[in-house]
C-alpha cells in the first residue's frame, strides 16, 4: 500500500455497514492485508470489536480470509509481530465469529476459511476441535461440494493429528 496513512480510513469504511461501499472496502482491505498484514496489527482491537457486526456476505468473506491470514501467521509462521499483537480476547472473538459463520447461511469460501481458522485456533483452545467436528458432521450432507471437501480435509487433519476421535 503506497499510502498507509489511509489505512485507518479504509478500516472505517469496512465497518460502516450502513454504507453500500463497506463490502468494497473489505475487498480492498483483504488485498492490502495480503501484502502488508502488519498494517492491521495496531488496529486489532477495533477490527475484532466490529467484525461481529458485519453481516453482508460480500464483506464477511474477505474478513474471514483476513482472520485466516492472522491465524496462519500466529500458529504456522509464528510471526513475532502477530504473536505480540493477537491477544487471547482477539482469538476468542475470532473463534466466535468463525463458529457463527459456520452455523449461519454463508458462502462456501467463508465457511472454508472459518473451518481452517478454527482448526488452527483449536491447537491452543481445546474445546474447539470437538465442536468443529460436530458442526461439520451435522452440515456436511446438505452443504455444497466445496464445503464437503473442506470439511473432510479438516476432520482428516484433526484425526491424523489425534486431536479428535473417530
Regions found by a protein language model. Give the residues of each.
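Helix-adjacent hinge/juxtasegments
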Residues: 38-91
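Eukaryotic acidic, Ser/Thr-rich intrinsically disordered low-complexity regions
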Residues: 133-166
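Structural helix-adjacent loops and short alpha-helical linkers that scaffold large soluble proteins
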Residues: 39-40, 127-130
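A charged, amphipathic interaction segment
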Residues: 99-120
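N-terminal interaction modules that seed assembly of large macromolecular complexes
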Residues: 1-38
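Hydrophobic residues within the alpha-helices of tandem HEAT/HEAT-like
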Residues: 28-34, 63-76, 113-123, 155-164
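HEAT/HEAT-like alpha-solenoid repeats
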Residues: 8-19, 45-55, 96-106, 130-143
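Residue-level detector of extended alpha-helical repeat arrays and alpha-solenoid scaffolds
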Residues: 22, 56, 60-63, 111, ...
Amino acid at each position: 500500500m503506497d499510502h498507509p496513512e489511509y489505512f485507518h480510513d479504509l478500516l472505517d469504511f469496512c465497518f460502516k455497514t450502513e454504507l453500500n461501499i463497506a463490502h468494497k472496502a473489505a475487498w480492498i482491505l483483504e488485498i492490502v492485508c495480503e501484502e502488508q498484514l502488519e498494517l492491521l496489527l495496531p488496529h486489532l482491537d477495533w477490527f475484532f470489536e466490529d467484525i461481529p457486526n458485519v453481516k453482508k456476505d460480500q464483506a464477511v468473506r474477505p474478513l474471514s480470509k483476513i482472520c485466516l491470514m492472522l491465524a496462519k501467521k500466529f500458529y504456522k509462521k509464528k510471526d513475532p509481530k502477530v504473536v505480540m499483537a493477537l491477544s487471547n480476547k482477539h482469538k476468542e472473538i475470532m473463534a466466535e465469529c468463525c463458529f457463527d459463520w459456520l452455523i449461519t447461511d454463508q458462502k462456501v469460501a467463508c465457511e472454508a476459511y472459518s473451518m481452517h481458522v478454527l482448526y488452527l485456533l483449536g491447537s491452543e483452545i481445546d474445546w474447539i476441535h470437538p465442536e468443529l467436528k460436530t458442526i461439520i458432521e451435522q452440515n456436511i450432507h446438505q452443504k455444497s461440494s466445496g464445503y464437503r471437501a473442506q470439511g473432510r480435509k479438516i476432520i482428516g487433519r484433526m484425526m491424523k493429528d489425534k486431536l479428535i476421535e473417530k
